């Protein structure tokens, strides 16, 4: 895959004179720059009953405007929130479905609620192979993003140890808009736009979206990302407030980047880079754009369907909503947010499986089963599936590898409503801000999944191969594989789940003195789960000429029905003390529960709890803003589900583990502006996350102790953060901002036994922004030094015990150096 940063730089050089000729000189009235990545003077709306100044918040919150988001130039939502303190994010999985952890909670993001305008697009962030992250795509319609870590999160949202709220644009009296084009050396072409303004007396509109095509940051053999979204907010003013109707349509396909083999398992010092590029390589194959998936129908009979690997994670999401905001003369205010959504998703991905295997040893391990199945068998040999020609393992250093195709269909429908009443009371000389609310939701999800394991040559974008049996005359008598498939029906699931929930809540802010404020809140959630799933057995699909169907997961024709009713109570309490107008301290304790996901039943109900405690200080000086927080998190139980692929059968085998996690730490966000032309900003987190009391849940409810006490959770660094300078200057009619951002991620482990180490790494990003009147031109370069590093090992096999080596031989790399040129016209 080519990278052409010089071409992009040349485009910038050529574009600048043209802009200089057409644009008027920049003036403060035309465009006004922001003070920095972090500002305590910003009003926030997340985590509180009413909007408040960020300096007044009694909890850790980071707020970024659209302009500040643009300067960060995030690759995806995970990289955006990962730039904030207290949040560790892995953004290397692609556009969506990445990993992010809040203050060491190792749940891959299901304890963080992603919202748009104060309400989540789906009530459960942990969907079936999707997260609400995939339903929220930042574009020019985003006005700001606010991230609350801990604090009041469990009062104002369900399953929330943190809230990430994207605030969208609303129409106003003054029309405005922008058009943006983005091109990148990954084959990226993107067009964004929005317009907002007044339609008629009392009616206002904001509408916009994007379309995008991207070949991808790694070579998958076809376009990685293709699609876009459109959304609108239509507002009507009322006598005491406003009514806003919201709508959004998303239709987007995204590749899911997997770990790749890096070293030869027979000689772990030998790199596989000649076979698969460590930066851009994947095992994805264009040959699987017409994959024939054979699986069990509802009654156990074989069925065949064509799937397309290039569809990736294809999400079609439709949203309608209505937000009512009223302020009455008697001091009461009312807010009601109602949404109805539908998601239709197909998911096609080739998952990483076991490490590469010696081709001769692989064939020998299948010889006994082949001898038993095919009388007259004399030898085994490899051929390419597509044309039947001989495959010589010497062409891939004697290696073959397996990959598992996962094909899924998901439909999710939801309705949610959040009603709040707010009023300020004076009582005994003190003031109380009371918020009364009730959140209710109904959501249903159906799913249908088929797994099929393939045998591949060991190289980048491989072809599928077959291992066939021959008699003494060279005639084919059967196959270990068929059509490249090692095992049909490696896994098979289907079902539907229905969930309803109701959550009344109350929060009070008590202004005790001019300097001291106390806050408390409680939320009680009641869930009702009903679900069915197909019962399964293991059997044969009736293919006499192959071993590949001998251990298929088959439906029996019967259904298992489950039911569960459960309730949880979340709470928070905190204080804020302003020592003076520029220095404040705060403290907070909270408890949040992660309610069971859809389909839960009495046999598997398991409700993790996050107890969070924090103590922080805030500094708001003329040239320095600081938000520093010491925190402690206890997460129990810590649930781990692994789905490894058996190297002998190719079937998926699941195991469940349970333990506890504690995480003391410190997070810091700061901006220092020593001069008008210089700004320095930093976000830093240190946490000492440890696992204890880990057990494996085995047959009949028994447990087996796994000795990992005191170890770090897999893929969790102790130290991570970013920092960098920004220079601001003017040359003639052009205003410039140039910045460097240094990012550091500390040592992590691929496994809970802490045997396979993911080395610490650092990267450097550069950004050049030039403004002239209504024009912005921005050049962003990520991983400037082309650092190679890994964000994970191979979770299908190494979550508990590692890869048998100190350094990983299989892993998912960060993206190589890449650049983007962004041109925006504001009007």
Predicted regions and their residues:
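Gram-negative outer-membrane beta-barrel transporters
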Residues: 582, 632, 656-752, 822-826
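C-terminal beta-signal and adjacent terminal beta-strands/loops
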Residues: 636, 675-679, 685, 743-751, ...
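Short acidic/polar hinge/loop motifs at secondary-structure boundaries
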Residues: 120-149
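Structural signature of Gram-negative outer-membrane beta-barrels, strongest in the C-terminal barrel
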Residues: 410-412, 431-475, 493-635, 673, ...
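Acidic/polar loop-and-plug regions of large Gram-negative outer-membrane beta-barrel proteins
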Residues: 235-237, 242-319, 346-410, 465-497, ...
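Extracytoplasmic beta-strand/coil segments of soluble accessory domains associated
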Residues: 28-32, 46, 53, 61, ...
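Short strand-turn segments of transmembrane beta-barrel domains in outer membranes
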Residues: 144, 151, 163-198, 205-220
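N-terminal periplasmic accessory domains that precede
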Residues: 77-80, 98-101, 115-117, 131-135, ...
